[in-house]
Amino acid sequence: MVSILSNIGMMVVTFKRPSLFTSLRRRSANNIIITKHSHPISTTRRSGNYKPTMWDFQFIQSLHNPYEGDKYMKRLNKLKKEVKKMMMTVEGSHDEELEKLELIDNLERLGVSYHFKDEIMQIMRSINININIAPPDSLYTTALKFRLLRQHGFHISQDILNDFKDENGNLKQSICKDTKDILNSSKDEHDNLKQSTCNNTKGLLKLYEASFLSIENESFLRNTTKSTLAHLMRYVDQNRCGEEDNMIVELVVHALELPRHWMVPRLETRWYISIYERMSNANPLLLELAKLDFNIVQATHQQDLRILSRWWKNTGLAEKLPFSRDILVENMFWAVGALFEPQHSYFRRLITKVIVFISIIDDIYDVYGTLDELELFTLAIQRWDTKAMEQLPDYMKVCYLALINIINEVAYEVLKNHDINVLPYLTKSWADLCKSYLQEAKWYHNGYKPNLEEYMDNARISIGVPMVLVHSLFLVTNQITKEALDSLTNYPDIIRWSATIFRLNDDLGTSSDELKRGDVSKSIQCYMNEKGASEEEAIEHIEFLIQETWEAMNTAQSKNSPLSETFIEVAKNITKASHFMYLHSDVKSSISKILFEPIIISNVAFALK
């Protein structure tokens, strides 16, 4: 908040702004005492009162994962060969399309599909070629087919779902029954829901999941999201099926918490393994492969983390900048969410270092720096020259030089591997980020309230996603084209859509209590001020914008792009991570399950003998 202390000619400025990777929410305001001429008389600085990390250097270095051993890799490779044989058998079958679809769906949910990319694409191409001559399918099969084809980049029309539309272009009421119909006409002799009704719910669940892959101007799919959601919520409320169908309830509840298309892949895998092993039709070969692969990949992530932990300790920045958060593990979790596969360690280690500096600089702008210092730091970032350090206070000099070293390291690696000097693109992204930070500081300092459009134009930069994705582009792309470089001038659509969703999720996760303590206005408050809307109406509008932006993101993915498939996957996964990190309360528990807690494999000892 800003108040004028006219008797001494001073202003007390409180500024607080969340940015990328601030999942540990700030809890108090920042008081900076400056004169009306913006020259410090006295400065009351504070730490953020952040709690010490629960995953310190000793803990990380002491991590020991037995699944790093060669014997487990041998078993994994043997299981992979067995699964490939199974896939070849399934691929050769012309009659069991559903079996093929469910196999691919399970491989993806179990987190092992990356081992079988070629085999999966061969099956999907075959399904796509025969799509117009295949006989009519059930809702379950058709919805699953539609989602998987779109997910794998095939241009499949929503018209494949025409058999399930009524004359008005809506989902048939016979498919999506109301509560009264279910209660009165769908019970069996044991007063439970008929199996046909439970099967229908499986189909509606698949349709609900598929609807989130809609692109622009697909009103049927957008309306389908609402109608299937209503049915699935009623189904959960009733929960009257037998023991087998309690599994369906779990699947529905999980989907309603966060749509499949918006879920972080690694979190989905950890959850689904625990579900799959309780299914009566679970394939023991797939189950063992999934568990073993999860633990081996986790061992790779722990190795990444040990290396990063030593790097972080050697920088000495934790001691030099005690006001900043020590959240190395949380920062690396974003990198794991972006690309978890073991072959991407190089990407995870470098991008985690970049993210670490986002959180440090975020704390400088948010917690510690005066407005004068922030202006000097922003200018220094724009110059990207060690001589620019001369005007900075000592604590900023340390951060500034360390940042230059890390980003120059990234640029050197790209130059070495691709013969392209990307430093101008990297430094521009940092300059854009710091300018957006400073803009928000000035808005608050001057008491200015932007409208929603003006706020978002700046906020989609200040969230940090464009900067992270620019660095990611150069770290995951094998062939960097001139067209891809040119697209970075104003940030391509995929980056802007990802940043927009990320920012809106961050804003939804900002509590009203935080705003009272001095947080700047977010998109919700901007919309309320601009439209005279209630908070509930504003939240509903922001949620609508998120879904609309996902449609734009899906549309952008469906078009030819100069950007690599791996980069687009990173952009999507970063976006998915924002849904979880900002809107769920059990983040630390989830991080532990992904990075530190292996899955128990009861039969692995026997298998390895």
Swiss-Prot record:
Cofactor entry: Mg(2+); Mn(2+)
Which residues are listed for Mg(2+) 3 binding in this entry? 506, 510, 514
Which residues make up the binding site for Mg(2+) 1? 362, 366
* Transit peptide as recorded in UniProt: 1-42
Cofactor, how bound (note): Binds 3 Mg(2+) or Mn(2+) ions per subunit.
**One GO cellular component, as annotated:** chloroplast
Family the entry assigns = Belongs to the terpene synthase family. Tpsb subfamily.
Q: What does this protein do?
A: Involved in monoterpene (C10) biosynthesis in glandular trichomes. Converts geranyl diphosphate to linalool in glandular trichomes in response to jasmonate (JA). Can convert farnesyl diphosphate to nerolidol in vitro.
Name-wise, this protein is: (R)-linalool synthase TPS5, chloroplastic
